């Protein structure tokens, strides 16, 4: 039964999805990882085994396992990190500012107009995913990090300004700074809604 006075009750009426908390697609690691893997396979993308093996993830199962552990460590729903990574990298095909060897799965530091490779670079897959998780936590809450900070842009975020997936897009985020600019992860229209659309197809 939903508590109408509690946060989960509020979510059912506001139509937004909390970034923090336990997975919405499974109650254990094996189930959640399998659903992420299945979604990747359905995309018909070819996993960049050679490039990501160098960073410790030779296959999509290993990648999703690392992703799950890093998300759970900071109380972030793993499927949100997965969907965002797939959206940002085109199912790990890359092709934009960020290159596969940079182990940057969230477009960290890839500001509109930057040249190829002009963004954050990490030493391996786990560190890259950890940075993405930490950056998302910066937007989602004001809680301290559980792991040491590897996200060099963590302190650039105004904490807690996008607690919901749907608010990750600046155009949909109701919070604004003193200049009247909206907060959020990305400037693209419906950014957070596109993440949720992918998650909804995983159940």
Predicted features along the sequence, with ranges:
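Catalytic cores of secreted/periplasmic lytic hydrolases that degrade extracellular macromolecules
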Residues: 6-203
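Short, aromatic- and glycine-rich surface loops/edge beta-strands on solvent-exposed regions
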Residues: 2
